[in-house]
Amino acid sequence: MNKKILFLGVGGIGVSALAIAAKRLGAHVAGYDSVANKLTAKLEALGIVIFISPNGVDVANFDIVVYSSAILSSHPLLSQARSLGIQCLQRAMFLAVLMKDFSYSLAITGTHGKTTTSSVLATLLCQLDKYSSFIVGGVVKYADSNIQVNGTDKLVIEADESDASFLFLSPQVVIITNIDLDHMATYNNSYQTLLENFTDFVSKESVKSIYLCVDDQGCRDLLAKYNQSDKNVTSYGFSINADVQIYDYHIIDEITHFKIRYKGDDLSFKLQLPGRYNVQNATACIITCLDLGFKYEDIRNALIKVTGVARRFDLYTKVISGHQVTVIDDYGHHPVEVANSISAVRDRYPNKKIIHVFQPHRYTRNRDLIKDWPKALSLADQLILLPTYSADEQIIKGAESQDIVKGLSGYLLADGFDHAIYFLEKLANENTVILIQGAGDVTNLVEILSE
């Protein structure tokens, strides 16, 4: 890739990964972001020039400009590049270009779990095939990075359905974890339009194998809608109707055990990640690797080394009011993700009381899922609800934090982190486990606990 490429919004997790991948594939790379952070520091350490002010950037020196969704079309650097006739590519469009440098690409998509599933498959393939690479939307703990380029054989990518940008991609393998109602403004608030976009994605000529979780209603709807016979379509899940059925799920000493029935064989596995949903995610990756020709024993040995992705059920021990307390930091921000996480906490800590500290993310999500929130937020033993993280949205009347728990009782409304800590200091002890959850800045609460 002998090109000069400028990445706008390079301080984000997705664009930073593309910048590193492009550099390792031979491109001359520079980046711009309005704020320096850990990711821009990492890029500078790799020899990538980072601009914090647009004033020092000579756009005319570049062949391609890649931009994140956070960069407005009116941004001066993007406007200048377009006026000069320089090729300008949205993040997913450039990922599609990068994919052409690899022999075989595997894309993971779905409303929930795609980052975790991508990290599982990336961890497996990097152990099973030293020439495998990955570009995902989170820090894979096994590699302590969101990107690794080990060659140009296999590439694992996360395909984003939230803005329909997965339609730019042309992989050979597609894993769909689930199809649910989120980011519905992208699909004109139409479930049928959402399904049609997923159908268009898996119908691409490049796609040869499709793996879907049949436990999910959205995936079942897609299977009913999809009728092409020229592709290898495999369903997986706990359902007896799955082509590859999961069974005998149980926890021993905080290790998840399960079996799958694959082409007549009963195969057993162990996994460090918690919950039925992560067993579903892992199964998709296992059968993908089996179909690629890797041996069961090698996959089994690699799977137990999978530690997932940052901010997905991260475990900490904190001292709170003199008590050692297990604290879990999790990115979940949708009712389905909340319910799955609380179920996983119950499975792993059956004798402990769950205190759920939740920070809603986006007023539009509160509004669109207003009927689903009360059930999900009632599942813990104690809910502490924080103000909604706006993500730059304007407040929507009737869609604030207190509105998503209408009909519930016993919850505690915290006006900020200090208030939440006050509640935790009153409630937490050795017999409790604290789940701190949300896609905003609530992870900072984990850091300041017991300081």
From Swiss-Prot:
Organism superkingdom: Bacteria
Main location group: cytoplasm
GO terms for cellular component: cytoplasm
UniProt-annotated location(s): Cytoplasm
InterPro entries: Mur-like_cat_sf, Mur_ligase_C, Mur_ligase_C_dom_sf, Mur_ligase_cen, Mur_ligase_N, MurCDEF_pg_biosynth, UDP-N-AcMur_Ala_ligase_MurC
EC number annotated for this UniProt entry: 6.3.2.8
Gene3D superfamilies tied to this protein: Mur ligase, C-terminal domain, Mur-like, catalytic domain, NAD(P)-binding Rossmann-like Domain
GO MF term set: ATP binding; UDP-N-acetylmuramate-L-alanine ligase activity
GO process terms (BP): cell division; cell wall organization; peptidoglycan biosynthetic process; regulation of cell shape
Keyword ATP-binding: yes
Binding site for ATP: 110-116
Enzyme class (EC, first level): ligase
Keyword tags: ATP-binding, Cell cycle, Cell division, Cell shape, Cell wall biogenesis/degradation, Cytoplasm, Ligase, Nucleotide-binding, Peptidoglycan synthesis
Family under the similarity heading: Belongs to the MurCDEF family.
HAMAP family registered for this protein in UniProt: MurC
Name of the protein: UDP-N-acetylmuramate--L-alanine ligase
Organism per entry: Francisella tularensis subsp. holarctica (strain LVS)
Encoding gene, per UniProt annotation: murC
